[in-house]
Amino acid sequence: MNLSLTQLSVPPTDAEVDAWASVLTAAHAADLPGVPVPTRVEIAGRLRVAPTTGRHVHFAADEGVASLLLFTDAGNAHTASLDVLQVRPDARRRGIGTALWHRVREELLAQGRTSVSTMADLGGAGQAFAESLGFENVLPLAWYVQDVQDVRDVRDVATGTAGAEHGLPAGYELLCWEGLVPQAWVAAAALAHGSMEDAPTGDMDEQTPAWTPQRLHTVQRLVLDRGGRMLMAAAVTPAGEVAAYTSLVLPDPAAPRALQYDTVVVPAHRGRGLGRAVKLRMLGEATARFPALCEIATSVADENTPMRAVNAALGYRRERGAGIFQIKL
C-alpha cells in the first residue's frame, strides 16, 4: 500500500503529540478495556524528554505510530527496544502495522542493530503481530495489580514506626524519599540497585549497565522531567547500607494507577522479610501522599517466584500475561 510515514519533530509539536495520543488511547481502549489509558501528560513526557539509555526515533502514519529506542551505551549498541507499535483498531489489517515495522527495521539495520525486543500482552493483537514477524517470547512475565482501596488499613506504616508486625526485623530502619535519593544515601542505593543483576532476564540481548550514583540520579530525574513523581522506600542499616528498597512511579500524578518499579533485597539481607516491609512502607506513603491513587501495577517474570510470593501476600492479583518478545535481524 502507498502509506505516508513521517518522523516526528524533535521535540514533537502539540499537534503531533495529540495525534499520537489519539492512536494510543484508541488502541488501548480496544485491547485493554479494563486498564486505565495512558494520559496525555505521560505520552507527551515520553515523546518530548529523551531517555537516559539511548535515543528515540518516532514514526507516525495517519492511523498508526511506532517508537524505537536505540540504545547508546557500549554494552547495548547491537540491540534496541521497540517501545511502541500501534494501529488504530478500525484501521487494522490494512498493512499499516507492517509498513511501520518495515520502516523500523530499515532504521535498525542502518544503525547496525542485530536484534530488537518489545513487550506484548499475551493473547492479544500485539503478540499475534509480533509472532507473525518472527519475534519469540524470551522472557514470560505477567502484570499484577494491587487495589490500594482494599489495603488502606496499612497506612500506619507511613509514620516510619513500623516494627516486626510489618516484617521489619531488629537492626533496620525504614526510610522513604520522594524525587531524587538524598546525596547521603545515593551511593548505597546505587550499590543495592546492582543486586538486580540476578533478576530473571531470560534470553534478552539487552544488558543492564552498571549502576552508579550518577546513573541512579539520572534515571530518577527523567521521571520528574517527564512530569511524573517518584517515591523510594528503603530498609537501611546503622552501617549506612541500603539493604532493600522499592520504587514507585506515577507517570501522571493525577492518574489513578501508579507503577511499581524495581524491588530489590541485597543478597546478604534476604530471607528476613525486607521485601514485604519496604513494599508495605511504600503503600502507606503512597496512599497518604496521593489520595486519588486507586491501584498499583507491576510486572514480574514468571520465574521470579520469591517476588511473586511477596506480591501475593500483599494482595496483588494477576491482571494479564505478557512477555518480552525478541527477534534477530
Locations of regions flagged by a protein language model:
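Conserved GNAT acetyl-CoA-binding A-motif
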Residues: 80, 108-121, 257, 286-299
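Conserved acetyl-CoA-binding loop-helix of GNAT-fold acetyltransferases
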Residues: 87, 93-106, 132, 265, ...
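Acyl-donor-binding surface of acyltransferase catalytic domains
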Residues: 89, 93, 101-184, 322-327
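Active-site/acyl-donor-binding loops of N-acyltransferases
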Residues: 135-157, 284-329
